[in-house]
Every structure is written in structure tokens, then in C-alpha cells.
Amino acid sequence: MNPFWQHEELETCHSTQSLAIERVRRGGYQGPFSLSALRQTEGVGQRGNPWVDSGMAVTLSLAWEVQGEESKPDERWPSWISLWVQQALVDYAPELTPVLRLKWPNDLIISNKKLGGVLVSQFAHEGRTFRVAGIGINLAWINPQPETFPSTDLQSVLGRPVDRSQVVQRILEVTAHGLETAKDRDLLDRAVLDLRAPLKSLGDATGK
């Protein structure tokens, strides 16, 4: 896995997002880390809604400390993380380039159907500030699909099996690179606003 993140994969957990926060609060933070689970039992969805489990998904949370100016809350973080996840998916499957889009602020969509999303939270612990990004991507719908919103999955779109470990690996690589090198916040903002912007333009913001 990417050396920036201390990564751990779990068979099952209640929520990678909640577990990441719990670990920091218990004093377990020793640098940026990531948690993924093959199955979540109480995942967190958008606006406090329960996570809808597709049956085969990327459920991944990233946790890192922020200091100085970086510690100021910024509502743009979900969009920035979503852009990096979008780039990672296109790297994994280039044929997604013309169809994978970001619905502001944090939904990844294909043909107006939700493929996944990102949640970002920030909290303080013992005088330090931490940020946690939860990432969920539908890889294959095995369970019944939700009736409340149209959804899709990567396997159906690609028409072939999806390697979950490779998708996770690429997300870790791109997000690590983005967090380490992103300087041009204006460029990231422009990419968020222009849903038709070529994804390769994001490399200019991350030094790729």
C-alpha cells in the first residue's frame, strides 16, 4: 500500500469513518492512516443517512492531522477529495473518462446515477486537529438497490469484474499525492465547477 497511509483492511466493522475517529480519540494516532472494510454494518451516508451497502464496495476512510492554516474548516474539502477519487477511478479504468462526473459537492455519478460519494469531517482532540475523509464506491450491486435514488456500480458500467484491492490502492496513491503536493486550490475549485473539465487537468493541481 502507499507509504503515506498506514493502511489496515478489516473483514467487517460498524463504520470505517467512526472507527477512524475512535482510534484517534483513544490515542492511537501515529501518522496518517487509512481503514477499509469488506463490510460495514453501520456505515454513515450523506446528511446523516445510513450507508446503503451494495454488497461489494470500497468502504474506506482516511485520517490525518492538520495544522496551522490547514486546520481552518473549509467546506471545499469534500469536493477536492472527490476529485482525487474521480481521478483514481479513471486511472484504474480509463474508459470511465468520458462518463464519470462529480455532482457538487461530493457525489460521483455516471449517467445521472450515483456511483459513490465522499464525506469529510474535522474534529479536535487534546489540542490537535484532525480530518477524516470517508469514501464509498459501489463496485457491484449484490444487495437490493435503493429505491430512494438512482444508483449504479463499477462492474455494471465496465462490463467486467472489478479488482477491489487495485481500486483501493489507486485511491490511496492519488489522495496521498494530492495531500502532499496540492498547492493550486483555485485550479481545484475550477475543476469542481466545470464538470466537463478533462480529468487530466487535475494533475496540474497535484503535481502529476
Q: What is the role of each PLM region?
A:
Residues 1-98, 116, 124, 161-162, ...:
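N-terminal lobe of the biotin/lipoate ligase/transferase fold
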Residues 39-44, 108, 130-132:
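Short glycine- and Lys/Arg-enriched binding-loop motifs that mark or flank ligand-binding interfaces
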Residues 60-62, 106-108, 118-120, 133-139:
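A structural signal for short, well-ordered beta-strand segments
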Residues 96-112, 137:
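Catalytic palm active-site di-aspartate
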Residues 111, 122-127:
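Flexible loop/coil segments at beta-strand boundaries within sensory signal-transduction domains
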Residues 127-158:
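Short, acidic (Asp/Glu-rich) active-site segment that either coordinates a divalent metal cofactor
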Residues 159-208:
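Conserved, helical-rich catalytic subdomain that frames metal- and/or nucleotide-binding sites
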